[in-house]
Amino acid sequence: MSAMRLFALTSAMLPLAFILSTSPFPATAAEKNVIVEQRNASSSPKQRLDQLFSQLKRERDPDKASSIANEIRLEWNDSGSATINLLMQWADKAIEEKRNPAALDFLDEAIALKPDYAESWNRRATLNFVMGNYRKSMSDIEHVLNIEPRHFGALSGMAAILSNSGNDQLTLKAWERFLDIYPADRTAQEQVNMLAEKLAGNRT
């Protein structure tokens, strides 16, 4: 699992496939072209995201919901600033080459230039987790959720950290928040059911 994949977990925790599916990856050139073509010139990024999240909340088919989630990720990956986008690309490359200190520098700069861009915080949260800096990772996640409370990728990261700490009750709450945004995700459903049963068993 590369550093860009959101929050590596042990086999007893989240399946790798789910972490990959909830991580917001950098968009390819082709994907960015699709975004541009699909965007309505009269709609703002916030309006597009609001519409996509509304669709995601209503959709019950997992495959269709996954497609909507991918559109949301693509929107998240565009900061609206060429400078920030370039810094994020440099950070991604540094992470891929395992130059984590350089990646942190790029992400720190992106955050300093545009502190309201959630994805730079989220990317740094991922890197901090991979580097074992769990408190810093959770702090970054909280910043992400302050900016974009519907960030299901950050919520899955929060659940991963809480699960690692052994706090099943708070892990369950994180997954319930996730499902309130993205109800069709099967793995999140399984996590909620598993944790609910485990906690119920502990009470008996």
Curated annotation (Swiss-Prot):
<feature type="repeat" description="TPR 2">
    <location>
        <begin position="118"/>
        <end position="151"/>
    </location>
</feature>
<dbReference type="InterPro" id="IPR011990">
    <property type="entry name" value="TPR-like_helical_dom_sf"/>
</dbReference>
<feature type="repeat" description="TPR 1">
    <location>
        <begin position="84"/>
        <end position="117"/>
    </location>
</feature>
<keyword id="KW-0677">Repeat</keyword>
<keyword id="KW-0802">TPR repeat</keyword>
<dbReference type="InterPro" id="IPR019734">
    <property type="entry name" value="TPR_rpt"/>
</dbReference>
<feature type="repeat" description="TPR 3">
    <location>
        <begin position="153"/>
        <end position="185"/>
    </location>
</feature>
<keyword id="KW-0732">Signal</keyword>
<protein>
    <recommendedName>
        <fullName>TPR repeat-containing protein RHE_CH03534.1</fullName>
    </recommendedName>
</protein>
<feature type="signal peptide">
    <location>
        <begin position="1"/>
        <end position="29"/>
    </location>
</feature>
